[in-house]
Each structure stands twice: as C-alpha cells, then as structure tokens.
C-alpha cells in the first residue's frame, strides 16, 4: 500500500525471549543509541510481531502479540470486517473474540492490521483464522488465530520507522481495566479505508479499550 511504501525499517537481533504464559516479550540488541523509540512496531518476514514498550541505550523490550495483555485491531483481508485479536499467552496462537454470528469471517481468512487506534500501520499480516466456534455466551463466535510471524523462532526482526504510532504502555504500569462493553465493531469496510480511520480509543497494551473477551 502507499502507507507501507513510505515506511523505513531498522534491523535488530533478538537477545532474549520470554514466552511465559503470563508474559510474552522479546529483548532486542538495539536501543535508544540506535534510534529505537517506544511505540515502534516490530515485524519479521511473515508479519507483525509486536511493539516496543521500553528502551535502554543499548536494548529494547518488545511486547509480543501473544502476550495476554495485548490486543490489536484487525481487518479481514477478504471482506474488510473489523475485529480485535487478543494475546492468548501461547506463542503459537492468538485469540479472535466477539465475532458477530452474522459476520463474514471464515476459517482460513487472513487478518491484517486495520490501523485503528493508531498503534500500527494498516495492512500488515497478523494471522490466519482457524475454526470458528460459539463462545461461552453463545451470542458471538471465537477462533484461534495462527500468527503470521515466527514469534518463537526468529533471530532477526525489523523495526518500522517513518510511522508515528500511539506509544505502547507496559501492562504492569496500567490501572485495572474497566468492565468491557459487550459486542465488537463489525462494520463492513474495505481494508484500504483503514488508512484514514475515524478516531478510536487506542488498544494500547491492551487494556481492553477495544471490546473484551
């Protein structure tokens, strides 16, 4: 897309990875001295990995998509439906929740960043939808999502530059999340329209600003 065409990237290597079910992070070998900033999106050849949440002069800490306190607004590449994907605490799966029963979402659909919330540029691969099933309320559907990025195996990553995101916040620094409102936005919109989305609460470090599970 035109938005992606304006982006620059910066290479970094993974120093350490933490895949505890309650904490999914990367430690990179580049920090403030290399121009790394809190809020930068991190990708690999497959797709989105997460976002920088802290830096030192020589390192950066990345909150992975799979962290249970993380969520990212997405759009279904095929239909444009806008939904939210949550971290599951597992490096091999994300959680798609609050899918309306009538939503045009199918197993195998590719999910892309929608750009809503201002944290990530639109159009980056997030994952692939698995089997849809009713959630506990029976009023919505949910599904596991296979991440597009190799979150547990990559040695080198790319940090996006040339995009001004809403900074991420370390979940440990956040106040308790409010009770989420039921339902999820499901307006049918073209993915390309996400390049200029309406104002929306940030899903930053996912405080359940987006509808919760």
Outline where the language-model segments fall.
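A secondary-structure micro-motif
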Residues: 1-213
């Amino acid at each position: 897309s035109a938005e992606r065409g304006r982006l620059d990237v910066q290479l970094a290597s993974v120093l350490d990875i933490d895949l505890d079910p309650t904490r999914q992070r990367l430690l990179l070998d580049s920090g403030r001295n290399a121009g790394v900033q809190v809020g930068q999106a991190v990708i690999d050849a497959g797709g989105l990995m997460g976002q920088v949440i802290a830096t030192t002069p020589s390192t950066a800490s990345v909150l992975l998509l799979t962290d249970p306190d993380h969520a990212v607004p997405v759009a279904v590449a095929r239909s444009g439906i806008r939904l939210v994907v949550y971290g599951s605490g597992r490096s091999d799966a994300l959680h798609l929740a609050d899918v309306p029963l009538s939503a045009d979402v199918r197993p195998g659909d590719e999910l892309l960043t929608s750009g809503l919330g201002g944290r990530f540029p639109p159009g980056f691969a997030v994952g692939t939808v698995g089997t849809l099933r009713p959630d506990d309320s029976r009023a919505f559907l949910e599904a596991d999502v296979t991440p597009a990025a190799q979150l547990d195996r990559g040695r080198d990553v790319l940090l996006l530059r040339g995009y001004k995101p809403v900074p991420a916040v370390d979940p440990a620094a956040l106040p308790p999340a409010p009770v989420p409102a039921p339902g999820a936005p499901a307006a049918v919109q073209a993915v390309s329209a996400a390049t200029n989305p309406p104002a929306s609460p940030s899903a930053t470090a996912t405080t359940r600003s987006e509808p919760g599970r």
